[in-house]
Amino acid sequence: MGLLSQKDIKPFVQQAFVHGKMEGNVFHASEVCLRMLEDSKNQDDPKLGRYLFIGDSISGNYDKALRTALMGKLNIYHPPTNCGPVRKGVENIVQWLGAYDQPGLDWDVISFNFGQWDSANTKARYQDDLEKVIAELKKTKAKLIFVTTTPIPGGYPPPGELGPENKATGRVQKTMERFINPWALEVMSRHPEIEICDQHALISNEKFYATWLKKAGFHKKGENNPNGDLHIGGLLGEPVGRQLARKVLDVLGREDEPLSPHGLVSNDLDPRRQRSATKDIDVDDFSDLLESDQRLRKYRR
C-alpha cells in the first residue's frame, strides 16, 4: 500500500485507525483509515490562550457556567465524549490532547477529574492510572488543575466498607470524601505543581447545596427523586463552574482579572421557579457566591 510520510497528514487534524498484524517486532499495516477532525485553529481567537477541561457528565453540568465565566478570555475545549473513569483517560488521553506540539494547538491550561465512574475502583488501580494520565498531561507543559470529585448526596445508600484489594464502596454516601478524593490527593501530593480546585469542599459547605446534599439520590436504579441525583444540573452547576473558572485565571497569573458576568436574570433566580433541590434558595447569598472571588477561592488546598 506504500508509506504515508508525516507531510501526508499535516496539519494534524485527522484521526488514524490502523489495521494490520505483528510480524516479530514489526507491525505491518494493511489499511489506514483517516477520519477528519475539527480544525480548532479555524474557530480559535488567536489572541486568546487555549484551555482543555477533562471530566465526566458532572463537567457537562457546569459546562455553561464555566464557559460563561471565561467568555472572551480563553478558547475553551472539552473532549467530545463523557471522559468517564480514569481507565478511559489512560486509553484516550493522547487523542484528547491532540497535536499540542503543532503551532496553534498547544494548551495553556488543562483541568481534569476522574472519580464518579471510579467509585468502585481499587486504590492501587485508580492511583496507577492517574499517574499514567498525569505523565501525558505534563508533556504538554500546560498549567494543570485537578478537580476534586463532587459528593454523592444523602439519598443514596449509606456508607460501606472497603472491599477486597482496597476496592471503594461504589455510589453510596461518602465514597468520595472517604476514598476517591483522598486517593487522588495522595497522588497530587507527589506533583506539587498541580493546582487543586476543590469542588467537593464548596458543595459540602455552601448552604445553597444543603437540600440537594441531604435529599438527592436513590437507593434503587429507576427510582424517581424530585431532588435529582448526583448530577448538579441547572443552578447547581453555577457555583462550581465559576469556582473552576476563577482557579483557571489564577493559575495563569490573572488573579486581578474579573470573571465575565454570570448572565443569570431574575426569573432564573425566582424561588417559585426552582426545582425541589433549589427551592429554598437565598437569592442574595447565592448571587454573592457567584460574584465573590473571595468565596470562590475559599476552598483552597
Predicted regions and their residues:
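Helix-enriched interaction subdomains in cytosolic or periplasmic regions
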Residues: 2-24
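Surface-exposed amphipathic alpha-helices with a cationic face
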Residues: 134-138
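A short helix->loop->beta-strand "cap" motif at the edges of active sites that frequently abuts
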Residues: 139-144
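Conserved SGNH/GDSL esterase-like catalytic core that processes O-acyl groups on lipids
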Residues: 19-132, 153, 231, 267-300
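Catalytic His-Asp segment of secreted/periplasmic serine-dependent ester chemistry enzymes
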Residues: 2, 10-11, 151-301
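A cross-family glycoside hydrolase active-site/sugar-binding cleft signature
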Residues: 113, 147-149, 200
